[in-house]
Amino acid sequence: MFVSIQELVTLASNQNKSISEVMIEQEMEMTQQSREFIWAKMEKNLQTMKQAVERSVQGQGVFSPTGLTGGDAVKMKKYREKGKTLSGDKILAGVQYALGTNEVNAAMGLVCATPTAGASGTLPGVVFSIADSMNFTHEQQVRFLFTASAFGMVVANNAMISGAMGGCQAEVGSASAMSAAAAVEAAGGTPQECSEAFSIALGNLLGLVCDPVAGLVEIPCVKRNAIGAGNALIAADMALAGITNVIPADETIEAMRSIGRRMPSELRETGLGGTAGTRTGLAIKMRIFGQDVSLEKEEE
């Protein structure tokens, strides 16, 4: 059993096992289910992610009932096909898949919460991007999810994964860090390098607020998932290059928890502060719900 990232890394290193294998064995022990049963459940998660990504680029794309989001995954796909991108195709593939997944979520479609529905695009963005470019097998993709879940479980148990409790750092931040760690293992990195990637990725997004316009998981949520995917890929490459993070992963999680607890309620999923509290954000809320609930009036 492990309750911290350090314990996870030590366990994997001492037993000469991958983090994904450690997670599979712990899940078997905790649930008293067979390896085949646990593997099949994770395969279902992977299939759900894949279906959302594929749906997002059918025709003109998917659009939310409000019309606030939709069609950006198709735009990114067409842009990638031109072959003249600034960021490189691997990162932009991740961006496309992340955008698409969250557009499906905003359109009331089926997604896999990783770790939440609002942050459901980042991890699929990363796993399918590197699966494309590195020709990953189905097994490697499933193991990617187990690795990510090991890190995510520690975050959930030791801090928070909901925007209502800790801001978007707890949602997209956690998703990005989980994805970075899993990407490192998938690329052949060590458990310690997975931990470094995790802490780099999460550290980059500390303090990120949750400020959904009109209280809907659309603006800025969809694009934040895309940025989370890019952040994860960059953090993974940094770790694989031998770059380390001065602040250990567990302490980075502690920092996120501390920041989240200090974050005002207006910046924790209430749809009152940040971008939600801008003039444009309030106008959108007024148009959708027909009531003026500006933060300024509530403070009066």
Predicted regions and their residues:
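Glycine- and small hydrophobic-enriched segments that form the cores of compact globular domains
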Residues: L86, A113-S120, D132, T137, ...
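Alpha-helical support elements that line or immediately flank enzyme active sites
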Residues: P124-N135, A183-G188
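A structural signal for small-residue-enriched, beta-sheet-centric alpha/beta enzyme cores
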Residues: G163-E171, A175-S176, A180-A186, P191-E300
